[in-house]
Each structure stands twice: as C-alpha cells, then as structure tokens.
C-alpha cells in the first residue's frame, strides 16, 4: 500500500556552522540521503514530502567534536505491506529442496520466502512469476536495509469465510468516513473496465473458489457466478450502493454479513441476513457496523488490485501459457475439482 506517514527522528550534524547557513535545504538533503530507498519504522520510504517541525541545532557537549544534532518531524511517501496482502507478481529466484525465494515485481523491493512444500516445490520454476499471499505477521522492515523481507505462499482460492454480526446501525458520520475506501474501489473498477475482458474472465475464473467447467459462462458485468453456485434463497447487495444509501439513512446494517465463496473475490457484493444461516466453520464475529464495513471494503480493494495487477503482469497469451503449471496448481485446490 502507498500512503503518507509522519516520522520523528534525530539527525547528527557533522558541520553545524555550514548546516545552519541553509537549514531547510541541508535538512531535506540529509533526510533523503539517510532514508529514501530504505526501510524505516515498518515502511519503505519512497520520497520525503515535507518537514513538519524541527528543533534548533544543538551542539554536543559530551565531547569536543563540535558536532551537533537536531530533532525532526517529517512526512514521507511510503510503501508498506501487511499480513495476508496479495502480490500478483513474485519472480522465483531460487527453488531447492529447502526453500523457495522470490522477489516482488510490483511492490517496494521485498524478498519473499515461500516455505517449501512438495506441491509448490515441484511446480514453481526459477524465472517463473507466481501470485503470492503473505503470511500472518510476516513482513520485516529492518531499518537501513534497501529491501524488506516476508514469508508467504502461492495464493490458492480460499474455502473459508467470516460472518459478522452487527447489532448497531451504521451512522451517517461513519458512512461518510468510509467514502475514502469506496472511492478507491470505484477507481479500481474504472481501471478494470479498461483492461482486456478476456484476461479478466481468465483470472476471475481461476480464482473462483469452485471448479468451473469451460462451457460455464461468467457474467462479470453483474458479478454473477456459474449456475448452481448461487445462494438461491438470498440476493447479494452491492456494498457500495448500500453505503450511499446509508448516507441518506435509507438502509439498515443490522444482522449477519458475509462474503461466502460463491461470490467472485473482487466483486463489491456481500450477503446480509436477519438470522445466521451461513455455513461458516467459525462462530460469527460480533463487531460494529463500521469495523465490519472497513473489513469488507479492504478485502474488496485487495482483490480488485490483485486482479488488475494479474492482468497487467500476464498481459499476453504466450506469458499465460508459460505459467500453465502454476494455474493447474491453483485449479487443483478448488472445491469440486476432480482429482
């Protein structure tokens, strides 16, 4: 994720006299030399965007070096990864019986360790590009390093899902706070609309949880899955439309919410029930409407960005065909696959 962050640090100043002739320019240059293109406080710093606050230049009195130091608050454009993030393009650089190593082609520089398993070890080849999901609490930003490190695995369609129990209505103020995430989704949907429709169908079908025969049609324009995979008693709601109605107090968020496997992962759809009849493996999570919607919206963003990145990375039929072994590994993990 790309974001703005604010940091605090203390800089050592070798030549305080020269430094103070043009503090802002020297300070910005020093910050860029030390932090840009490196890891710092759980982020990878892309650019220094501003100096928010600085102290005077203090002279060190513990020795006779004549050096100084300055406390600084600055803002920076950063990139950072979170647990369970999806990365569409990780190039395999090493694969042996002990470990698989990959480098992300899309995010900040990061080396990803893929724990070796029999299936993944036998399939992934050096030089191939694989989609990866990061593991829980697996991203490490060691200060001063020029790349982060993480652990993950080749991303396989998930069979499990969470159910959320909302017992208080979403307020207009909370709905307004969610519009930033809604805007990101709409931007990603706009970007998606400009991509090759055949590619979108290929990857949506690949990451649909159920195994789909080649003659089953996907109506991606209305996010409708193959016949027989729908929850016949329920009609999904568009989360974006729901939140726009919430701004006008025209919708109720009470009840049980979920995004079960019959929905396309990147669809802006969810199911809402008065009584919980979802066939989930875990008990419902009791939470506020705001927390639930933030969770759903971020999941939709993650998958939409993932699908867009897949289309951009595997942008021709030859490249897709060169990775048929990866697609087969993914296909074999679906519900209903004939082993």
Swiss-Prot record:
Keywords: DNA-directed RNA polymerase, Early protein, Host cytoplasm, Transcription, Viral transcription, Virion. The lineage of its organism: Viruses, Varidnaviria, Bamfordvirae, Nucleocytoviricota, Pokkesviricetes. Belongs to the asfivirus D339L family. One of its GO terms (cellular component) is DNA-directed RNA polymerase complex. It comes from African swine fever virus (isolate Tick/South Africa/Pretoriuskop Pr4/1996) (ASFV). Signal peptide: none annotated. This is DNA-directed RNA polymerase RPB7 homolog. GO terms for biological process: viral transcription. Induction: Expressed in the early phase of the viral replicative cycle.
